Swiss-Prot record:
It catalyses: 5-methyltetrahydropteroyltri-L-glutamate + L-homocysteine = tetrahydropteroyltri-L-glutamate + L-methionine. Its EC number is 2.1.1.14. Catalyzes the transfer of a methyl group from 5-methyltetrahydrofolate to homocysteine resulting in methionine formation. Its cofactor is Zn(2+). 5-methyltetrahydropteroyltri-L-glutamate binds at residues 17-20, 110, 512-513, 558, 602. The gene is metE. The keyword ATP-binding does not apply. Coiled coil: none annotated. This is 5-methyltetrahydropteroyltriglutamate--homocysteine methyltransferase. Pathway: Amino-acid biosynthesis; L-methionine biosynthesis via de novo pathway; L-methionine from L-homocysteine (MetE route): step 1/1. GO terms for molecular function: 5-methyltetrahydropteroyltriglutamate-homocysteine S-methyltransferase activity; zinc ion binding. The keyword Repeat applies. Keywords: Amino-acid biosynthesis, Metal-binding, Methionine biosynthesis, Methyltransferase, Repeat, Transferase, Zinc.
């Protein structure tokens, strides 16, 4: 039986971030809608052509999005909240994504356990009419180039519901969507597609079993389209849902064999003879080449159970960059073992070709393939190249529990820490980076300016930022982070064991792209990383300047990590480096140090049974970094896009003096969770959404702060934006901060009056 190949999605931003540039030009009225759509279609066409050239048999299409594919499907199914219905077309689309005219955007949160963000649909009874026209047109264009290889990718109905905020009865919502999905599938059948991928990653969640009846009734309805359905899951295993998922009326079921325990489940339960198994064997979320021996072992086991398989990446390839061959400045032993999207296509095709060209799957025979032998040799060369640091290894071996503890408990530390006005105001750390600031880094990289000239220019930006914060009236200042291209990249560039790409961009959300570092060896800090800029800022003001660090867990979760040692060990190596930085900042006069952990929660395994293991080492890594701080030094941390209710005990164990939170876009849910848990430490309540260009009014901010005061003791509360301000423009930031300070003054007076009346 010939083994076919498939893809489940592809990078969306363009090899040179063409979509990002087009979006930002469109938002600044420098590009019209027609040109924006043309850019997106050109990227789509290039993606299809590449997959066709490589020889992929079933090419997933329709996943490219101007901002977010969940938003795309929300609009197609008429899930449009009333506040956006006065807009139409792209104006409506981007109002939902970014907010407009004082109307807030949809809530944004992380896509499962990845660093991609999606916009949370709000489902009420008032559905708008469906409109699949853009998707159907995409399918037609794909068929023109790809013919029967074109396979539409559709976000599954139960995953769409699971990701949504339901404001109606679940059964009604399922019934509505079920009928409209059937309409869509019939439209696709009329176009002559050979199959449709229904992406249901929600099936790997623990609660999937409770949706069993909904899945069964939904797929019983969808089968009426008489169209082959390919059920796609990824990010983890099916768990307890395995037996009934195998009985769903679909022709192919795809599973992720790079995460979770699907291989063990396959051994236990077998696989139905009437279905094809989609084998997600190439890791769609990391950037390393396959380990031939390991991959062939897995495939040997799978084929001993079912011969009817197709091969594909474990997930969409949107989580990896385009092409590792472009990274010519990386050391050759490292570059040779990298696999970005284009290389992963090659790996899928290679494995299928090797299996199809051999009689049977004996590993010894298969491993004689010259291409697989070459990959083995590349891995051996890399292992000799990858740095090992004996000092770091010794420090890890000698760690004790005392290294993870602050000298005094929180209640005693607080009395020693700086005294500030009630409800002190601050920011999360970064300020807008203009084109001129970004150009400074480019000039330095090209050796067009010296390091001294670069630092002098950065110092001017710091001085301007400090003056601005003083003029606005903030209580605790920051230096603005103008020297940092990215909160992870900046630190990684100064740590041994990290490597950086030139073209390794991936989408975080909308037009925001990041270049995750690559961890390839032991991590150490050769010299201080942030002390110089902190000292410059603190010398310019009598107010406290908060020093800014990125935490070890966020650096792990936002990097492409090693696969030869546990992530926990890599996190502790980073924590040791940050621990030394905290000590140096204290010695330089820092009274407040923020260790950001915005990605703490996103690293949670999708199944709660594995949470404690992750949270144990994640919290320990933070505590190791912060534990060196003196009791009079106030340690802050920041978390965004987080639901805290189910991990609050672990957040408390971080033992941070001040926790700042994303809050405004989640309708205060985060605030309420912290309140319900009886959290005792100080909380920086995110009072406005920095991901929207809208400037919050004083009245809006006053109402937000009143909610905070109603839920937390005033002496617990700090006032800050939701997140860093780097991606905003100065003309948005300045009035927003002024309004925030003005609103805080109003609330301070109300709190004082309330105390006097008590």
């Amino acid at each position: 039986m010939t083994i076919q190949t498939a893809t489940l999605g592809y990078p969306r931003i363009g090899k040179n971030r063409e979509l990002k540039k087009a979006l930002e030009a469109f938002w600044s009225n420098q590009l019209d809608a027609e040109a924006l759509l043309k850019t997106a279609q050109d990227i789509e066409l290039q993606n299809w052509q590449k997959q066709l050239e490589v020889g992929i048999d079933r090419i997933g299409i329709g996943d490219l999005s101007l901002y977010d594919s969940v938003l795309d499907w929300s609009i197609r199914f008429g899930i449009i909240p009333e506040r956006y219905r006065s807009f139409t077309g792209l104006e409506q689309y981007f109002a939902m994504a970014r907010g407009k005219d004082g109307i807030p955007a949809l809530e944004m949160t992380k896509w499962f356990d990845t660093n991609y963000h999606y916009l949370v649909p709000e489902i009420s009874e008032a559905f708008q009419p469906t409109d699949f026209s853009d998707f159907l047109e995409t399918v037609r264009r794909a068929q023109t180039l790809l013919g029967d290889r074109a396979v539409p990718i559709v976000l599954g109905p139960l995953t769409l519901l699971r990701l949504s905020r339901l404001e109606t009865n679940l059964e009604q919502a399922v019934s509505y969507l079920r009928d409209r999905y059937l309409i869509l599938l019939r439209e696709l059948k009329n176009l002559g597609v050979v199959e449709v991928q229904i992406h249901e990653p929600a099936l790997v969640l623990e609660e999937a079993d409770s949706f069993k009846s909904f899945y069964q009734s939904t797929f019983d309805t969808l089968r009426q389209a008489n169209l082959p359905l390919h059920l796609v899951t990824y990010f983890d295993d099916l768990g307890a849902a395995w037996p009934w998922v195998m009985e769903l009326p679909v022709t192919c079921i795809s599973l992720d064999f790079t995460r979770g325990h699907n291989l063990a489940l396959l051994k236990e339960y077998g696989f139905p003879a009437d279905k094809q198994l989609g084998v997600g064997i190439i890791d769609g979320r990391n950037i390393w080449k396959i380990r031939p021996e390991s991959v062939l072992s897995t495939l040997e086991t799978i084929q001993s159970i079912t011969a009817n398989i197709r091969l594909h990446p474990s997930s969409s390839l949107q989580f990896v960059p385009y092409d590792a061959k472009r990274e010519v400045k990386l050391p050759e032993p490292l570059r040779d073992v990298l696999s970005f999207a284009e290389q992963k296509l090659d790996e899928v095709v290679l494995l299928a070709r090797v299996l199809n060209s051999n009689d049977g799957t004996n590993r010894e025979i298969l491993m004689k393939n010259p291409e697989l032998t070459a990959i083995q040799a590349q891995w051996k060369a890399f292992e000799q190249f990858s740095p090992v640091n004996p000092t770091v290894q010794a420090r890890l071996r000698n760690l004790s529990v005392r290294d993870l503890e602050r000298p005094l408990p929180y209640e005693q530390r607080r009395t020693l820490q700086p005294t500030l006005p009630p409800l002190p105001t601050t920011t999360i750390g970064s300020f807008p980076q203009t084109a001129e600031v970004r150009q400074l880094r480019v000039k330095l990289k090209r050796h067009e300016i010296t390091q001294a000239e670069y630092e002098a220019a950065i110092d001017e930006e710091i001085a301007k930022c400090v003056r601005l914060q003083e003029e606005v009236g903030l209580d605790v200042l920051v230096h603005g982070e103008f020297e940092r291209s990215d909160m992870v990249e900046f630190f990684g560039q100064q740590l041994s064991g990290f490597a950086f790409t030139e073209h390794g961009w991936v989408q975080s959300y909308g037009s925001r792209c990041v270049r995750p570092p690559i961890i390839y060896g032991d991590i150490a800090r050769p010299q201080p990383m942030t002390v110089r800029e902190f000292k410059v800022a603190q010398s310019l003001t009598d107010k406290i300047v908060k020093a800014m660090l990125t935490g070890p867990v966020t650096m792990i979760n936002w990097s492409f990590t090693r696969t030869d040692i546990p992530r926990s060990e890599q996190a502790m190596q980073i924590a040791l480096a940050l621990r030394d930085e905290v000590a140096d900042l204290e010695a330089a006069g820092a009274k407040m140090i923020q260790i950001d952990e915005p990605a703490l929660r996103e690293g949670l395994p999708l199944k709660a049974e594995r949470w404690n293991e992750y949270l144990s080492w994640a919290v320990d890594a933070f505590r190791l970094a912060a534990g060196v701080a003196k009791p009079e030094t106030q340690i802050h941390t920041h978390m965004c896009y987080s639901e805290f209710g189910d991990i609050i005990e672990h957040i408390e164990r971080l033992d941070a003096d001040v926790l700042s939170i994303e809050n405004s876009r989640s309708n205060n849910e985060t605030l309420f969770q912290i309140t319900d848990a009886g959290y005792r430490h100080q909380v920086g309540v995110g009072v406005y959404d920095v991901h929207s260009p809208a400037v919050p009014s004083v009245e809006q901010l006053v109402q937000q702060l009143r909610t905070s005061v109603a839920n937390l003791a005033p002496e617990q509360i700090w006032v800050n934006p939701d997140c860093g301000l780097k991606t905003r423009h100065w003309e948005e930031v300045i009035p927003s901060l002024k309004n925030m300070v003005e609103a805080t003054k109003t609330i301070r007076q109300e709190v004082m009056q309330s105390k006097n009346n008590a």
